[in-house]
């Protein structure tokens, strides 16, 4: 406790000493997560850098992962946050309840240290979730240094915690209160959907802007047959496009994306007579991946093969562009966010079948760039129909290609510069 008091005291001293030396066109982009798996925050960092801002990008960098997109930009400096020790990473609900406070304390000290050694910035740009302890630190930084903070709302922290503990758990209710009131000091709020913006405004969050995810320039359709053949070679499984259709889905292997819905749909597909063979490419990392790997070994299908690689940043968009059809299993813990994986597929000109939830229609327009279904049976029927009716599939593909024309830079440059430039 004494050490903690000393650290906090020194932190206050440093903050006060540096408060008057704020760099007006410097921004700290903070990711309390694996930077390699935070593409939207990477895109923000690159976009700020293109606008002439000096960007300090902070986040976890796990061993063997590539930080990728921003490495070569002269205006961006990446500073890794000290990673959580293995003993602070809970493996079950009971450990979560006991280790949670220690995890937050470690993050609090690590973030304070990471922020102290940075040159003062005019803005701190943070994502939510996670909101603990980030919102509190952002408030302190604003009070003591004058740094304004902007929250980029990807989802709600309390709704994700509810997946583990249940909606009525005391911790979930307390987190919702913390999230609602600690965020009110933000200079501005960004959301990934209009429905999310509407909810935040009922919470008193203003000003609030929608900044939709849009595909960056490295997610593009393949229009040259020679390039397509080169991209097909990057698929780490045996694949013959003349006899097999390629279906792709990306998942975080978490409870809000039930991969078994896809398996049930494919199991029904496997029983049909006049449908083509399928190679199902499932990308992503997460806690349920090994469990599903064992499941499909015990329950093999005849005309459906699975491939579950972890693709590099360079190979991922090229492989995605080879797909005939994409599937999105995301249902959202809050019902208010939108899946970036669909944006990536549209960027590559690939149509999508998506599970229905309240906000998905802001992105997937049923019958135009994809289809929306309610369950595994409907998913199976739509897959069967599209993969045996080329005209219908091509019509949706044209819709996806049209979506690919509106890019991240177009959306970002429309929304963000007026927010930050108006403060200087």
UniProtKB/Swiss-Prot annotation:
It comes from the Eukaryota. It comes from Schizosaccharomyces pombe (strain 972 / ATCC 24843). Belongs to the glycosyltransferase group 1 family. Glycosyltransferase 33 subfamily. This is Chitobiosyldiphosphodolichol beta-mannosyltransferase. Participates in the formation of the lipid-linked precursor oligosaccharide for N-glycosylation. Involved in assembling the dolichol-pyrophosphate-GlcNAc(2)-Man(5) intermediate on the cytoplasmic surface of the ER. Its main location: endoplasmic reticulum. GO terms for molecular function: chitobiosyldiphosphodolichol beta-mannosyltransferase activity; mannosyltransferase activity. It is an enzyme of class 2 (transferase). It catalyses: an N,N'-diacetylchitobiosyl-diphospho-di-trans,poly-cis-dolichol + GDP-alpha-D-mannose = a beta-D-Man-(1->4)-beta-D-GlcNAc-(1->4)-alpha-D-GlcNAc-diphospho-di-trans,poly-cis-dolichol + GDP + H(+). CDD domains: GT33_ALG1-like. It is a single-pass membrane protein. Keywords: Endoplasmic reticulum, Glycosyltransferase, Membrane, Signal-anchor, Transferase, Transmembrane, Transmembrane helix. It holds the Pfam family Glyco_trans_1_4. Pathway: Protein modification; protein glycosylation. The chain crosses the membrane at residues 1-19. SUPFAM superfamilies: UDP-Glycosyltransferase/glycogen phosphorylase. GO terms for cellular component: cytoplasmic side of endoplasmic reticulum membrane; endoplasmic reticulum. Residues 95-116 dip into the membrane without crossing it. It is found in: Endoplasmic reticulum membrane. Residues 20-94, 117-424 are cytoplasmic. Its EC number is 2.4.1.142. One of its GO terms (biological process) is protein glycosylation.
């Amino acid at each position: 406790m004494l050490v903690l008091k000393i650290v906090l005291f020194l932190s206050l001293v440093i903050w006060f000493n540096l408060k008057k030396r704020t760099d007006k066109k410097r921004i700290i982009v903070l990711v309390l997560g694996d930077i390699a798996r935070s593409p939207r925050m990477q895109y923000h960092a690159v976009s700020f850098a293109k606008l002439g801002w000096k960007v300090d990008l902070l986040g976890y960098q796990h061993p063997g992962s590539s930080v990728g997109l921003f490495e070569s930009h002269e205006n961006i400096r990446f500073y890794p946050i000290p990673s959580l020790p293995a003993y602070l990473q809970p493996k079950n609900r009971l450990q979560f309840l006991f280790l949670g406070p220690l995890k937050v304390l470690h993050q609090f000290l690590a973030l304070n240290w990471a922020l102290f050694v940075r040159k003062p910035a005019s803005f701190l740009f943070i994502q939510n979730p996670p909101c603990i302890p980030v919102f509190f630190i952002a408030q302190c930084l604003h009070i003591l240094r004058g740094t304004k903070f902007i929250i980029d709302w990807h989802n709600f922290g309390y709704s994700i915690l509810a997946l583990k503990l249940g909606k009525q758990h005391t911790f979930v209710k307390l987190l919702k209160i913390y999230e609602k009131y600690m965020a009110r000091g933000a200079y501005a709020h960004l959301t990934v959907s209009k429905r999310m913006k509407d909810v935040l405004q009922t919470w008193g969050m203003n000003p609030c802007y929608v900044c939709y995810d849009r595909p960056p320039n490295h997610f593009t359709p393949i229009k040259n047959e020679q390039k397509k053949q080169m991209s097909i070679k990057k698929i780490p499984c045996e694949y013959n496009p003349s006899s097999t259709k390629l279906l792709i889905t990306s998942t975080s292997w978490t409870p809000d994306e039930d991969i078994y819905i896809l398996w049930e749909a494919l199991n029904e597909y496997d029983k049909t007579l006049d449908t083509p063979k399928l190679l199902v490419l499932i990308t992503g990392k997460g806690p349920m991946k090994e469990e599903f790997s064992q499941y499909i070994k015990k329950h093999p299908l005849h005309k459906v093969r699975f491939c579950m690689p972890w693709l590099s940043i360079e190979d991922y968009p090229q492989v995605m562009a080879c797909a005939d059809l994409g599937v999105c299993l995301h249902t959202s813990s809050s019902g208010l966010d939108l899946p970036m994986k669909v944006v990536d597929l549209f960027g590559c000109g690939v149509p999508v079948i998506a599970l229905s939830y309240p906000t998905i229609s802001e992105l997937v327009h049923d019958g135009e760039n994809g289809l929306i279904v309610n369950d595994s049976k409907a998913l199976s029927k739509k897959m069967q129909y599209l993969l045996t009716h080329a005209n219908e599939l091509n019509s949706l593909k044209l819709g996806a290609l049209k979506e690919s024309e509106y890019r991240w830079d177009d959306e970002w440059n429309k929304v963000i510069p007026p927010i930050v430039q108006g403060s200087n």
